[in-house]
């Protein structure tokens, strides 16, 4: 098993137990055409309008029971034609890895242009204990490499890409229909508001903070963007308010003595 998958599947659940770092939304249908699937500590997101559904992220590699989750939310993954990936980490991009079963077999994949360097093995994903660790996800050729501020119209659904490098170099957020923000792993949110995502998992924390400042400014200064909901990778779904960006100059912190989110599950990986 490749190291990043081994860490995600076998190690992460043990070292993170009791630290309450994540509070993903439960699998289900929410307001504003939003649906999600929970896979342990992470969410896959969906947005539906006028019979058209787009997906944001693909979750883990070969995640057991994902078929039942799709049935629960009433979405057929084979009918999804477009999936927007926030970044190429194993818990967000594993579901379309060529080494496993592609949960969106008929979808065009969209991914931040700079993520290609991780997929190609040209750069490492993180350094731990002096060891450079590469991403191990591989996806099929033909994905669309997104630039900042690209705009798409898919069956009447408007999608705007916002480049937010830091967690990874090609990390990308998506604003959908000017009212839903999908943040991937640039934000961690608790009852006090939003923080820059945890340094432990973020490749360039200072860069991530700068990206969040730019993202907030874009939202504040663009009249047609009227956010209603924020959908995160690991903090669930939140109604948009000023607290979402309240602490973006600080990195989120977690420990057993001082959990990040008191409302989060003690063990996010229990099924």
Walk through the language-model features, giving the residues of each.
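C-terminal regulatory/interaction regions
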Residues: 2-11, 260-271
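Metallo-beta-lactamase
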Residues: 13-17, 23-24, 61, 113-165, 169-243, 247
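Conserved beta-strand hairpin/beta-sheet module of binuclear metal-dependent hydrolase folds
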Residues: 19-73, 173-184, 188-190
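Hydrophobic/aromatic beta-strand patches that form the interior of the parallel beta-sheet core
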Residues: 35, 84, 110, 144-146, ...
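Short catalytic-loop micro-motif centered on adjacent basic/acidic residues
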Residues: 54-57, 83-84, 161-163
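Active-site HxH/HxHxD metal-binding segment of metal-dependent hydrolases
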Residues: 62-64, 71-150, 250-257, 261-265
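Short amphipathic alpha-helical segments
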Residues: 67-68, 96-98, 123-124, 177, ...
